[in-house]
Regions:
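Intrinsically disordered, low-complexity segments enriched in polar/charged small residues
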Residues: 10-11, 257
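Acidic, metal/ion-coordinating pockets
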Residues: 22-350, 354, 422-429, 442, ...
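Non-catalytic terminal accessory segments
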Residues: 21-38, 62, 66-75, 83-89, ...
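Bacterial N-terminal signal peptides that target proteins for export
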Residues: 1-10
Length: 597
């Protein structure tokens, strides 16, 4: 294991911060720096059935038409677009805004995410922020993956380290200004300084301070996550003291643009909401750009509505798009001239993209970006590397493990999704026997459902291990515990958290049902709570199942840490594989009835 090289990257970044870069003649003309950013790759290396919504030109107020679904994605295609965008810019930088690894399809997880780091090196990533999912396997494993070297084999491993030769680690620094070790020192370099045409530019990284509530506790043991804005502002002040005026913050936190969800290049963002916009309000004026992530949305908001406003960007997820920022650096001040800078989100076209969709979008872009979109082809080196990993994973990925009577999707419909209900039913089935815990119901967290389970062809459709793993990749175990009926009701009441507009509904098995009264005060929203059709006695001791992430208080479910008479069970993916042998079909049963009146 080589932890030295990645530490050296961090040390070099910090040294650059403190010492500044070698003095260079000040440029006489403005310097344009092209920033190409992507976020939340989540190990989606292959070209798959991914899409982005785009406004339908045939839609009118009188005759609205559904949005276009534009096929996009794939890291070979992403690398090809990056290459074309860099061709058109003498000065450029590629940034990843976190969650490149963790919560991934099998092709990344089966190689301990070394495949994703390998591909990012080949794409040419220059700077990355940490995301919450980088901590899924703990800080020590994160540092190993970034530094390089082979992971020692463990009993029962199905994953492979150094599958295509020695893992070289990341050839770019990972930044986290707000993640501190127990002794108060930073886990990673907080920032890095790079020079373009004689002008220094600082890049500061941060991750959502809510990471400890959405990552298994063992993954963040001994770490402290501080306020994002405060950490970035402190780092920006240090950068300015070193003569760095142009500052880019890459923050693994995000938001939404509710009023124009498909208008990912609208600068106005009238319906914007979410944590990143609250953070932006508290950032020092010295920060010129905010590259965001985490919510898998697309937006290009300019915050004060003027040409001098600060942009806040995000480019969806899974390599479906990139944010492109042409930052004009003023030679007199060394700062970003926001009035002359350009901010756009671009799709990553692939072979599945319809020609009409491609031409429609290209026609809406300024000439230099349109040229890059039209010229981009899949990068051969990345394509070959992904193919090699795919072939290595094929024996396990292609193994048929069950059948389904129809497709299960992740779209939330009145607080639930068919994919989430499937997983909850599988976990209940695995633990309802007395000798397996005697669970009366099961609950699944929506964030743990990572992908739909498609039915390809005529039902019953075969399901492979790769399909199941992509849907549920975290490797949690099942935990049966006891709470009283009153405690269970309180846990469900807590789905609506203070400061949040909408509740985050847990996904129940079919044995649990209730009504959610949206406009009722806290403590009165959950009504008619039933198990197997019978009202729940508040005083009764009730056994139920959750995954180990939830049982440890993940997703803010602190009450579950009080669960009594715990019994550990099998892995969540094993429970799902067993359930698929019954050929389940999607059900339309309403387990949670939402009343908005």
């Amino acid at each position: 294991m080589n932890l030295i090289r990645h530490s050296a990257l961090a040390l070099a970044a910090t040294t650059a911060l403190l010492a500044g870069c070698a003095t260079a003649p000040a440029p006489k003309e403005p310097v344009t720096l092209r920033v190409v950013a992507f976020n939340d790759l989540h190990g989606h290396l292959q070209t798959a059935a991914l899409n982005l919504p785009h406004p339908n030109p045939a839609s009118t107020a009188a005759n609205p038409a559904p949005p276009l679904r534009v096929n996009v994605g794939g890291t070979a295609e992403l690398a090809g677009l990056v290459k074309e965008l860099r061709k058109g810019a003498p000065h450029s930088v590629v940034v990843s805004s976190g969650d490149a690894i963790g919560g991934t399809p099998l092709i990344s997880a089966i190689f301990f995410h070394e495949a994703t780091i390998d591909v990012m090196n080949r794409i040419g990533v220059d700077v990355a922020a940490l995301g919450n999912h980088e901590f899924d396997a703990g800080a020590a494993e994160l540092q190993r993956v970034l530094a390089g070297g082979c992971r020692p084999a463990q009993p029962g491993d199905t994953a492979m380290s150094c599958a295509l030769g020695r893992h070289e680690g990341a050839k770019f620094p990972h930044l986290a200004a707000n993640v501190l070790k127990a002794d108060g020192t930073p886990l990673m370099a907080p920032a890095v300084v790079k020079t373009y045409g004689g002008i220094k530019v600082g890049f500061i990284g941060a991750v959502t301070r809510g990471t400890p509530t959405i990552v298994v506790p063992s993954g963040v043991a001994g770490l402290r996550f501080t306020d994002e804005a405060a950490a970035i502002n402190a780092e920006a002040a240090r950068l300015q003291a070193q003569g760095v005026q142009a500052i880019v913050a890459t923050i693994h936190e995000g938001g939404f643009n509710d009023a124009a969800q498909m208008e990912w290049n609208s600068n106005a963002c009238p319906g914007r909401r979410g944590e990143i916009f609250e953070i932006e309000k508290r950032l020092a004026p010295a920060v010129d750009v905010v590259l965001s992530a985490h919510t898998h949305q697309g937006y290009a908001c300019v915050m004060d509505g003027t040409s001098k406003g600060r942009p806040v960007m995000q480019a969806l997820s899974f390599g479906r798009g990139v944010s492109v920022l042409d930052l004009v650096l003023d030679p007199a001040t060394g700062d970003v001239d926001r009035s002359k800078s350009v901010y756009r989100n671009l799709p990553v076209f692939n072979a599945r993209t319809e020609a009409a969709h491609r031409e429609l979008i290209i026609g809406q872009e300024p000439a230099p970006l349109a040229t890059a979109l039209r010229a981009a082809v899949p990068d051969a080196d990345v394509a070959q590397r992904v193919a090699a990993y795919t072939e290595k994973a094929k024996p396990l990925a292609d193994r048929v493990v069950g059948r389904i009577g129809g497709g299960f999707d992740t779209a939330a419909n009145r607080g639930s999704s068919s994919a989430g209900r499937l997983i909850a039913d599988a976990q209940h089935a695995a633990t309802m026997a007395a000798d397996r815990g005697g669970a009366r119901f099961a609950l699944m967290n929506p964030g743990g459902v990572r992908a739909p389970l498609p039915c390809r062809g005529t039902p019953p459709c075969e399901v492979t291990f790769g399909d199941v793993f992509t849907m549920q990749p975290f490797g949690n175990s099942l935990v049966v515990m006891t709470l009283t009926g009153a405690e269970i009701k309180q846990m469900l009441e807590d789905q609506q958290r203070a400061g949040r507009t909408n509740p985050s509904f847990l996904l129940p098995s079919k044995s649990l049902s209730y009504r959610w009264i949206a406009k009722a005060p806290y403590g009165q929203r959950v009504q008619d709570l039933r198990i197997d059709g019978q009202p729940v006695d508040p005083a009764a001791a009730i056994r139920f199942t959750v995954n180990s992430f939830m049982a440890d208080g993940g997703d803010g479910l602190s009450l579950l840490r009080q669960g009594r008479e715990r019994l550990g069970g099998e892995l969540d993916i094993d429970a799902l594989v067993s359930f698929l042998k019954t050929t389940p079909s999607p059900s339309a049963d309403e387990r949670v009835v939402i009343v908005n009146d």
